[in-house]
Amino acid sequence: MGKSLDEIREIYRHPEGISQIAKAKEHEERIAFHTRVRTSDDRNKPVIDFLSKVKAWIAKDKYDIFLSMFHFPVKTNGVTSEIFDKLSRVFDGRNPVYNYQFKSSEDRDDWEYYRKDVLKEPSVWSTDGWDNFKHRINSVLVVDMPEVQVGEKPEPYFFWLPIANVLSYRTCGKDCNLMAYIMYVTDENKIVYIDEERYVRFDKTRENDLILEVDNMHDLGYCPARFFWSDSISLSEPDIKISPITSELDSFDWYLYYSTAKKHLDLYASYPIYSGYERDCHYESHDGKERCDDGFLKNEKNEWITGADGKPMACPICSSKRLRGAGSYVEIPIPDEIHNVPDLKNPITMLSADTGSLEYNVNEEKRLREELVRSVTGGEGELNRSEAINEKQVKAGFESLTTKLNRIKRGFEEAQTFVDSTICLLRYGDSFVSCNINYGTEFYIYTPEELSERYKIMKETGASEAELDALRQQIIETEYRNDPTQMQRLLILNEIEPYSHLTREEAVNLYKENVISEEDLRVKLNLPTFVRRFERENMNIIEFGSALDYKKKIEIIINTLKKYANGLQNVSVRPTE
């Protein structure tokens, strides 16, 4: 049952869920530290906490250097960008379904217009929705209504409400994601309350009193607001939602420290340190007012001579003999020669950083980055061509990433189903029956190049013909997913080519061993020529036999190509054969 206005004001004075809101805000801020790109120095709590940890890890002088190397945007922004780019393939599923049932065909047509032109679906979920998924996982989806209805039908809309704007809330007992009520502050500093019966808006006075501005009823029977994301960190904290990178936040902190500290190493370890015996300089000006002392000038009062910048002026003789270019030069005292034994040490030496240490730091940074991507996306994500990998590893990476995508897909489907159902009920009432949303059964996880590499690996490791057929089909569907005509043509060509997984050379060798017939070999070696002839004498292979069963169509084409291979001329084929 809905609240009275006095009860709503009491909620404002004594809000619920304060501790959970604070935890959710802190969690989102820590996520945003690694996901949101900033160009200005924003020392919020996650940044301060991170720098405090670094300060405890290293000595003070090293910490001061670390601070000078720490700038925004941080290095982990690039890692999370790569991660979420991989996960965004959830919106690139094959065979997506958006099925809406209405009692009236007019309402169904109106909804198709309304959701595409007004709500900007489905693209709004891959833009605004994905942005909230990355940075504000604890945001709340709110379906709202205009204050005044203008057209013939209500015009509900939805938005993502940041958890930082929520003042008080309570979830339903049976559904920990659906709100029983919610109270939040708008950007205009208005106080809004929504429950299962009404939309209420207040103006707030300087005395912190609430003045009623809007009080509109709705007949949904439930509060039109829910947590955007369904998956929680734990059963004990169902209102704190889990991001794909939540469990790796500490690892992101370590990678950021390591990559920043490596900048210090790069600053000096890339260049050698030269050393040589110190040189005795006897420079003195003609008037005797300037003389060299350890490479810098002093006056007749034995005081350092400074330039306009306040720094000691270098000796014109010594400075011209100093090291030019990258590196450092250190002077060492000339050794005393005892008993007239000369010092045979090389007067000029060069000290370089240990190559093994440098390579370790480079490789370790790369390993940490790859491990983060692998941990969050679930598996290899992309095929590594520089390392040996077998078929089982490829399958494991593919299946693990698919599992992650299916989990994310389910979360977006639940959120969009709630929004679309609620908007349809508010706009069409009893005319709306149901909706079914499915982002697709499979995803374009790999690029055509990566799939081709996987195909090569599976072929070399002895995969079955059925597995290779499925992967070849996936390569074609992925590469030509935006060109359905070419996709259909290549799928047909793949069907009619004999021994399609053999190269021309492999086919010839098997023919010599009497494994394949001469007829099949001729078709394989002359397939492009035979197909062009078939299309000249009949029609293109896509349109040919379009009224026939697909299996029958392929059978006719294959038999015709075999006739070509056997030397028959002017063979004409009718699709009705």
List the model feature ranges, each with a label.
Residues 1-158, 514, 521-577:
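Extended, helix-rich architectural segments
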Residues 88-521, 529:
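Extended alpha-helical, oligomerization-prone segments that build pores/tubes and scaffolds
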